């Protein structure tokens, strides 16, 4: 069914300057902000009330448009410290953003640029002034939607062409997006977490551990929390082979988050991960890294109905018996029924009982679906980094 949804009356305008055109033919009108042009992508909703800059720069959102359920986005502006993609000039992250209210002038002591100008520099197209919660309900009922977001300050759109492009885009399934966002060469990292009124600290102390981080679309705050454990980090591209990694003599290996279909990335990632498992080097994965680890042990991943995106998701850790509130950002999940006997499920989502963690019995190997580094979000799961380093210390004693 084709329909056009005008912007609600409080934000109504004479001529829309931005559109969201869904693959089913629905056209949603509003005001444009940020970059001009158009972009095809999957539309998801995020329920976080803060951290829009971190969300929009997370490489895991590659080829996605983020619909924010919180109405006021942009109030605190933007700054150079809250960006999450490894190389900001590459602008890896969301291609579009949807807000209920217009972007206002920022009010925050850390702000050095307003959101509208920042979106232009990041080449992110924004749609403002629509009923974002109605769109959220649509996604919840119909599942993740494919569509196209378009912005023209003059309001000139060829809607038929936009509809055809939206219908032609096939979605995230079978897309290996890690190759598009990964670093192109190895690099070092020594920045530690942010300190109030002091910014980010550099790890100049003598390092006790060497961690190799495989970059499938890694977030900066993950690296900072690893560096906080007296570790120096070597970041390597997603397709780095096992011989190159072992030659670096790591004390532990980290499998990062990232975008796209894990089954597509698995073609080159799984053989390396399987060899790492056999090496008995401690291994820790987050998000896409978790899914790739599951594929490496013979499990399967599946596309979710709507995915999990937000900073308020309850997860249970079966090891501690505790419930944690965590940040999540994924559209694929591990099929629990496909886990082999030597792999134990360690975490589940209390929203839908989907898998959120696993470990290999008898191996120093584990992973989680959620984001313990948060950024944005709660810090309930920070202990997982210590769990990783506990395994590393045990490994070094016997190595």
Swiss-Prot record:
CDD domains referenced in this protein's UniProt entry, alphabetically: GATase1_CPSase
Ranges where the Glutamine amidotransferase type-1 domain occurs: 210-398
One annotated GO biological process: 'de novo' UMP biosynthetic process
EC numbers for this chain: 6.3.5.5
Keywords: Amino-acid biosynthesis, Arginine biosynthesis, ATP-binding, Glutamine amidotransferase, Ligase, Nucleotide-binding, Pyrimidine biosynthesis
Catalyzed reaction equations: hydrogencarbonate + L-glutamine + 2 ATP + H2O = carbamoyl phosphate + L-glutamate + 2 ADP + phosphate + 2 H(+)
Top-rank taxon, per record: Bacteria
Protein name (database record): Carbamoyl phosphate synthase small chain
Organism (species): Bartonella henselae (strain ATCC 49882 / DSM 28221 / CCUG 30454 / Houston 1) (Rochalimaea henselae)
Pathway: Amino-acid biosynthesis; L-arginine biosynthesis; carbamoyl phosphate from bicarbonate: step 1/1; Pyrimidine metabolism; UMP biosynthesis via de novo pathway; (S)-dihydroorotate from bicarbonate: step 1/3
Annotated PROSITE patterns: GATASE_TYPE_1
InterPro entries reported for this sequence: Anth_synth/Amidotransfase, CarbamoylP_synth_ssu, CarbamoylP_synth_ssu_N, CarbP_synth_ssu_N_sf, Class_I_gatase-like, CPSase_GATase1, GATASE
GO molecular function terms listed in the Swiss-Prot or TrEMBL record: ATP binding; carbamoyl-phosphate synthase (glutamine-hydrolyzing) activity; glutaminase activity
Assembly notes: Composed of two chains; the small (or glutamine) chain promotes the hydrolysis of glutamine to ammonia, which is used by the large (or ammonia) chain to synthesize carbamoyl phosphate. Tetramer of heterodimers (alpha,beta)4.
Function: Small subunit of the glutamine-dependent carbamoyl phosphate synthetase (CPSase). CPSase catalyzes the formation of carbamoyl phosphate from the ammonia moiety of glutamine, carbonate, and phosphate donated by ATP, constituting the first step of 2 biosynthetic pathways, one leading to arginine and/or urea and the other to pyrimidine nucleotides. The small subunit (glutamine amidotransferase) binds and cleaves glutamine to supply the large subunit with the substrate ammonia.
Entry annotation: catalytic residues: 287 (nucleophile), 371, 373
List of residues binding L-glutamine: 60, 258, 260, 288, 291, 329, 331-332
PANTHER family: CARBAMOYL-PHOSPHATE SYNTHASE SMALL CHAIN, MULTIFUNCTIONAL TRYPTOPHAN BIOSYNTHESIS PROTEIN-RELATED
Ranges for region CPSase: 1-206
Family: Belongs to the CarA family.
């Amino acid at each position: 069914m084709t329909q056009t949804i005008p912007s609600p009356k409080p934000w109504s305008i004479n001529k829309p300057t931005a559109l969201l055109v869904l693959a089913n033919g629905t056209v949603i009108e509003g005001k444009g902000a940020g970059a001009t042009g158009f972009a095809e992508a999957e539309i998801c909703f995020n329920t976080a009330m803060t951290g829009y800059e971190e969300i929009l720069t997370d490489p895991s959102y590659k080829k996605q448009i983020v619909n924010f359920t919180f109405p006021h986005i942009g109030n605190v502006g933007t700054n150079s410290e809250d960006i999450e993609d490894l190389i900001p000039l590459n602008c890896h992250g969301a291609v579009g953003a949807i807000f209920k209210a217009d972007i206002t002038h920022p009010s925050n002591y850390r702000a050095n640029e307003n959101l509208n100008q920042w979106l232009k520099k990041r080449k992110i197209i924004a749609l403002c002034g629509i009923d974002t919660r109605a769109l959220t309900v649509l996604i919840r009922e119909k599942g993740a939607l494919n569509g196209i977001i378009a912005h023209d300050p003059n309001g000139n759109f060829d809607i038929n062409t936009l509809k055809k492009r939206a219908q032609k885009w096939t979605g995230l399934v079978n897309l290996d997006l890690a190759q598009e966002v990964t670093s192109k060469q190895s690099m070092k990292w020594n920045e530690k977490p942010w300190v109030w009124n002091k910014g980010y600290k550099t790890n100049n102390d003598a390092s006790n551990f060497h961690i190799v981080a495989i970059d499938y679309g890694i977030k900066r705050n993950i690296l900072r929390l690893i560096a906080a454990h007296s570790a120096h980090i070597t970041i390597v591209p997603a397709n780095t082979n096992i011989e190159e990694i072992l030659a670096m003599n790591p004390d532990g290996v980290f499998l990062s988050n990232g975008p796209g279909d894990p089954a597509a990335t698995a073609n080159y990632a799984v053989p390396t991960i399987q060899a790492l498992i056999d090496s008995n080097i401690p291994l820790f994965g987050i998000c896409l890294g978790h899914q790739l680890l599951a594929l490496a042990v013979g499990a399967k991943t599946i596309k979710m109905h709507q995915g999990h995106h937000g900073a308020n998701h309850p997860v249970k850790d079966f090891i501690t018996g505790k419930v944690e509130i965590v940040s999540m950002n994924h559209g694929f999940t591990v099929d629990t029924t496909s886990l082999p006997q030597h792999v134990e499920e360690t975490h589940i989502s209390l929203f839908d009982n989907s898998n959120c963690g696993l470990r290999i019995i008898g191996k120093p190997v584990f992973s989680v679906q959620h984001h313990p580094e948060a950024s944005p979000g709660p810090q309930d799961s920070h202990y997982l980094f210590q769990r990783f380093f506990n395994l590393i210390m045990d490994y070094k004693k016997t190595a």
